[in-house]
Amino acid sequence: MNDQTRQRLLNLEALVEAGFAPYPYRFPKTHSAEAILKAKRGAPPESEWPEEEVAVAGRLVALRRMGKVTFAHLLDETGRIQLYFQRDLTPKYELLKKLDVGDILGVRGHPFTTKTGEVTVKVLDWTPLVKSLHPLPDKWHGLRDKEVRYRQRYLDLIVNPEVREVFRRRSEIVRYIRRFFEAKGFLEVETPILQPTTGGAEARPFKTYHNALDHEFYLRISLELYLKRLLVGGYEKVFEIGRNFRNEGIDHNHNPEFTMLEAYWAYADYQDMAGLVEELLSGLVLHLFGSHEVPYQGRVLNFKPPFRRISFVEALKEKAGLPFDPLDLERLRLWADAHHPELSQVPNYKLLDKLFGIYVEPELQDPTFVFDFPLAISPLAKRHREKPGLVERWDLYAGGMELAPCYSELNDPLDQRERFLEQARRRKEGDEEAPEPDEDFLLALEYGMPPAAGLGLGIDRLAMLLTDQPSLRDVLLFPLLKPKKEAVEEGV
């Protein structure tokens, strides 16, 4: 225990001896800081409203004792407001010296404005609610060490108001998306997180074991296959906002635990879904920013519809300078071996995706639909109705990263079985990301799934883009981190 913690415990003891409950059960707040400031902002200096009693509570983030008067700043969820304590008005005034910055305090009083016009609460009664046993980070330098910010997000939220705003904005984004799909007649559903097989994407899963069922299960890597079962069951428009888990690497736009929206629309195709997504995102941006322009990492992205549309194959051929059709995987392998030896261990069918990420993806800053992907990298999409070797799939990019894939969904059970068997063959050859065939899903398809469009929208990446953050960790309240190796200090 350090000296500061020891002193704070002594201060707590003194408050208890004076008759205060150490950790009371409740405090009847009547106002937020924001509500008081909004009601009185702009009032002339030295105005006072003694008949308007307010009760506010929050954390002390500044404390300035000046003999017969004490000023403090109290922070609640909505912002901070100044408090004014006066010896001849405030009960137990001398005990204020037992308060520390970081304590949680409840006060009652009435609002007034100071000589400089600052809206302030004149405190007529006060109650310590929680004694903080540790000082807050330095007020001038705040909390800037990213590792500490991620591990102790609670401190980050206390001292960095802009961080609180990021997560409010994230919640607003999710709320808008949910209401949009509900207004379009989509039904929100929940599907299993624990699944007996993996499917819906190619990724390494997390495994777990269910003792009562004596069976190995996986944390889902995708929402897709269970939502498609609902189309078989008769629902025509469904969506889910939920967590997926992939046992893979971590970087600025990948996290093993992430949030996706998936939506499935029966009797529609990928062109229909493109129009819906344009409407969703352009409307969301207009709602948040008042225009279609989004500031992101030194650029301004324009979300005014219609979004740009390009071809996967043509864009890759042009940007990489390929003198042949990229769908010729044997020639593509020879070319990649000569120009990108670091990709020598990448299977041929994944080369297309890897090279697209190198040559095309970084240039896709304004929202862009990339249409018509190769069949080899799209095992769940319907074959293109006009272009052999391609599927009806688009991916939406913005800010140089993928935000959302969409398919005209494959609903031919025989074709789907063949593609699953190809994935199984690759799995036997050592591809750990290739899933095993999901026989129950194939059975569902054999009963008949209507033609449909399917969308997957990455909520974390979208939040990252619309809050101008450089990393997914900045839009995840508690991102996954390597456990600290240091021994846990003995608690107080």
From Swiss-Prot:
It comes from the Bacteria. Its main location: cytoplasm. It comes from Thermus thermophilus. NCBIfam families: lysS_bact, PRK00484.1. GO terms for molecular function: ATP binding; lysine-tRNA ligase activity; magnesium ion binding; tRNA binding. Its cofactor is Mg(2+). GO terms for biological process: lysyl-tRNA aminoacylation. It is an enzyme of class 6 (ligase). Mg(2+) 2 binds at residue 402. This is Lysine--tRNA ligase. Its EC number is 6.1.1.6. Homodimer. It is found in: Cytoplasm. Mg(2+) 1 binds at residues 395, 402. Binds 3 Mg(2+) ions per subunit. Pfam families: tRNA-synt_2, tRNA_anti-codon. GO terms for cellular component: cytosol. It catalyses: tRNA(Lys) + L-lysine + ATP = L-lysyl-tRNA(Lys) + AMP + diphosphate.
